[in-house]
Amino acid sequence: MFATFNSSMDNRSSANSPVAPSSRPKRTTVARACDWCRLNRVKCDDGQPCKNCRTRGVRCRKGSKSGEHNRPSSSAAASERARSQGAQMEPNQGNARAEEREKAATTSRRNSRTPSSSPSSPSPSQWRWPGAWIVDSVHTNSEPRYYGPSSFLHFTNRLRIYLDESLGQPQLGNALLSFTCSRVSSPSPNAMDDADLTEGTLTRQQEEYLLSLYWQSYHTIIPIVDADDFCAHYRSLWEPGQGATRRPSALVDIVLALCMQYSAALMASGDIELMDLESNDTNASGHWLYQRCQRLLLKDQDTLSLATLQTYIHSAVYLMNASCLNASHRVLSIAIHTATSLGLPHSPEGHPRGPQHALRQRIWWTLFFLDSKMSFELGQPYLMPEYHGTVDLSGSLELRIIENCRSVSTFGDITWLRYHDECLKLTSKVRHISNVAFEKSSEAMSRHSGTSIYENPSALEKGVSYLHKSMEALQAWSREVPTSLKLARKGNVSPFSTARCPLENDVYAPLWLQRQRVLLELLYHNLVMGLYRPYIRVADQSAVTSHAIGPTASHTSDSSSLCALNHAMATINIVYQVLTETDILNSWNRAFQYTWDATLTVLGFRLVHPGCPHSFSARRATAIANESFKIFSQYGYSGAAQAMTVTRELDRSIDLAVSREPG
């Protein structure tokens, strides 16, 4: 669980060994500094690339003169300064401090794997796949935030650098990164006006209507509440008599906040015009209830109970829906700590295995699922250790519990909890595959003196080869998914396939099951796309030095790019068909986030493979994604309108660059 810290501790101990006095040779002077060091007036060295360029992740060029490059030096200087300023929203002094902090953090992390430090090949632990430090474009006073290689923000940052260095469009690259940052760091509900705390009031009838939506939606996706216990708790909060008010409850408040999020998009009319970028986002609905919930939690912060834990988990989900993934991840860490303090990983001694024990199990494994998915998306260390055993939350005990569950029943050969089982199995397999693939590439990279794995195809191939072999395990998982939980396709096409075949809508299945089918398949495609995406060579040397904007048809054998593209296009096609033919995803923020994540991958493929035979399908996929963004915007997702704008700008830039290619 804490292997990340062990490596750094080993590095510190090796740095304190007796040979330390001779481990710092005198810096070799150079006759001419590289372009970046000259522009920023810092000392350069004779490394290739030099230490400063390695630290910043920029391409090191030496000896360029006026007219040698397509862009004049003033433009290069402007793009370099723009890159140092992140999304160009920080003040100069703030960026300088952030740059120094970033340099110090990166230098200390890489000192342990400097090629000159040891004459022999370094051990695998001395090279770790570097992430990216990104300045938050929303919270401009924040420190640069680190995102690991599995993060979609890490991939977005690589696209930004490519747009800047290869296409000469730093403004477009910064706009892309800035918008993607807003998908994980939107203004927190805590930052809203405190006056809103007293503005929101709901009658008992309104609250009960909202709670009825909960049993049809989140309860079937995040099964952490016992329906009977919750309803009994809710009734106990009301004083007898007409006009009575409800006593405070953090759990009830956060559940109501989630239901307000859900109902806001549900009740939005699809016939309205595109939402203005400054309009209120439906995902921020219920923020006054969220704020009140957090104040109640703070008041009782020393009280441990299952209700407190359930409140933290629902708060993390609320923040995730509000595009506050970083804040959601922090709240999730508090929830995991609370669950550990309550002893959820252990079976209470002397207590029978009854409904309460089953509820504790469901809560613990829900935390495992959320941690696996969210940490993978953000490229952060997992908060909970891997689990290689068998989890069965839909067994005979749960069948007895489900008989009393509100608004939910069995269907065919499954219960409503089987979806939860399959999500656990899938995310557990994916996080293990991701970790091993990174380790294999790191082991291969440690035997070379290079600093960028994207300039070492053999090291990348080690990880990609393992991913290809691991797909057999994921295919075996898909075959074991019950038929009732699979999303059927027209024709003789297997579920979880990337084939571009229309879906077969089962209108007779209950709504909760229809939604579970769609969300499970979207989860599968999103995770597999995330496995392959770090291995896409966005800005290799051939792409920079050639006249084309990326590798031509001879490079289309890049299997990682094609695999990521296929799963991205499958995601876009599924979301679009479901949005246009049903109401299942109208109020699910994750569907919008999946679509934007897939669109990033498709745009990245088009940037580096413009002449590829698959580029036509990729171009069509971006057009379909824009149609989905239009629908999302009509249902209250303010970020969807900006996603359309960014996607169209990138479309035009790619088409313009392709039209200028020679031949």
Curated annotation (Swiss-Prot):
Compositionally biased spans, kind Polar residues: 1-20
Gene Ontology cellular component terms for the protein in this record: nucleus
Q: Which residues bind DNA?
A: 34-60
Per the record, the domain of life is Eukaryota
Give its localization: Nucleus
Q: Where does this protein chiefly localize?
A: nucleus
Q: Would you tell me the protein name for this molecule?
A: Terreic acid cluster-specific transcription factor atF
- Give the source species: Aspergillus terreus (strain NIH 2624 / FGSC A1156)
